[in-house]
Swiss-Prot record:
Domain Nudix hydrolase span(s) in chain numbering: 46-230
Keywords recorded for this protein, A-Z: Hydrolase, Magnesium, Manganese, Metal-binding
Motif position, Nudix box: 128-149
Catalytic residue list: E143
Assigned EC number: 3.1.3.-
Enzyme class: hydrolase
Chain sites annotated for binding Mg(2+): E134, D169
Organism: Rabbit fibroma virus (strain Kasza) (RFV)
UniProt induction comment: Expressed in the late phase of the viral replicative cycle.
Pfam families: NUDIX, VD10_N
InterPro entries attached to this UniProt entry: NUDIX_hydrolase-like_dom_sf, NUDIX_hydrolase_CS, NUDIX_hydrolase_dom, Vaccinia_D10_decapping, Vaccinia_D10_N
Protein name from the UniProt record: mRNA-decapping protein D10
Swiss-Prot/TrEMBL cofactor(s): Mg(2+); Mn(2+)
């Protein structure tokens, strides 16, 4: 494992206070390397820099993923302050940008672009960063409603375990941490598509099959395998309505933040 990953305070805490369910598995593609470790959910810790995400299965046995409105590389180039680094990322990794992003950045950076190339899409599982007053369950409920327009009353979550991910962006050389849960919805993929509204983060939905190839499906299969294990010592349950979990979390957080 990359030396930088060994100094994660979050991972050190999780390993100390939660029973590990498997060894760490690592997969990679041209743009990222992902290391996954499953834990029994005994004493979860999180921060507002750690993404909380959900692998969500539909009533017709598909798994929901999201196609980002902007590529990760575009977001990195826009955020970066160094003009030299902006140009280097653009020239070196142009194919990891969306087609419409390439001419825009070419003009913005004053760098010629001869061939717009093929389309590129970054696919993610729904979720995001928790706000200061949120725990992971509250974060999931809000993010899933915002991103894919599914209400917490239509989602059941398996809170017996969670999977910790190290995501190494091989283009920007950044490392991100994610806590991943598993759940299911009472809606079909067609119902979800009909209710979905494109937003500032998500362009469209993608429905995955567990047998497909690719890094996302490697992670998906790992999480499904972990869900078959006995999560001894866990404080969670195999099937809990997300709405009820959120209500429970809000009551626990109320004294801390002074909610009414």
């Amino acid at each position: 494992m990359n030396e930088r990953l060994q100094y994660s305070h979050l991972m050190n805490y999780i390993t100390k206070h939660n029973r590990k369910l498997s060894k760490t598995y690592t997969w990679n593609d041209d743009s990222q390397r992902v290391s996954a470790t499953g834990f029994s959910n005994q004493r979860l810790r999180w921060s507002n820099k750690t993404s909380i995400c959900l692998i969500l299965s539909t009533l017709d046995n598909k798994f929901i993923a999201c196609s980002r409105k902007h590529s990760f590389l575009y977001s990195e180039i826009v955020r970066c302050r160094s003009v030299f680094r902006k140009k280097r990322l653009f020239l070196t990794y142009t194919r990891f940008l969306k087609k419409k992003e390439r001419p825009f950045l070419s003009s913005k950076l004053n760098v010629p672009l001869d061939d717009p190339g093929t389309e590129h899409n970054d696919i993610i599982f729904p979720g995001g960063l928790p706000k200061n007053e949120e725990d992971p369950i509250m974060c999931l409920s809000r993010e899933i409603k915002e991103e894919i327009n599914i209400d917490s009353k239509d989602i059941y979550i398996d809170s017996r375990f969670f999977v910790h991910l190290f995501i190494e962006d091989l283009l920007s050389n950044r490392v991100y941490e994610t806590i991943l849960f598993l759940g299911n919805t009472t809606l079909t993929s067609n119902e979800i598509l009909n209710n979905f509204l494109a937003n500032r983060e998500i362009k469209s939905l993608v429905f995955l099959d567990a047998l497909e190839k690719g890094l996302m499906c490697d992670v998906l299969r790992y999480v499904l395998a972990i869900s078959q294990l006995k999560c001894f010592g866990s404080t969670g349950d195999k099937t809990e309505l997300l709405y009820d979990k959120v209500t429970e979390s809000e009551k626990k957080m109320a004294p801390r933040y002074g909610f009414d």
